[in-house]
Amino acid sequence: MDMLRITNLKKHFGDKEVLTGLNLSVPEHSVFGFVGENGAGKTTTMKIILGLLKSDRGEVFVSGERVKYGQTATNRYIGYLPDVPEFYSFMTAREYLRLCGESLEMGKNDIEKRSDELLTLVGLSKENHRIRGFSRGMKQRLGIAQALLGRPKILICDEPTSALDPIGRKTS
């Protein structure tokens, strides 16, 4: 089964056509990446997949369900890490993951267990101070944990290692 299927996707901004009939299928249990120069439409495609941006034409299906602009029903299958993740700076990493878990309607015990696993995975398990004190690399690692929290079937990452130093890349 295809976890992601895109047919004849088109998008333009003003006079510039960014996507000109994109077609692709990504099977379950596979790895796929977009490679291209700035302005090639990589981030635009990701935002359309997430229902955050309206395409001019074409269809997107996630786990067999059609993605509709402005509706996030298919996002239950997706973990998303933007290029520069944003957080509530007054929270700790653990508090933030708890909030995200609640929005995903995860059980309290599952949230705590999964948060512990992921904070350990990304090397933030001992960080108890507010996110406002995190470096950009630490925020990127927290973004990775957030994207993985709900055990997504699809993980969409926009330049996921851009803020990680070599040690942070090994940790994540």
Regions found by a protein language model. Give the residues of each.
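Conserved ABC transporter NBD signature motif
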Residues: G58-Y69, A73-T74
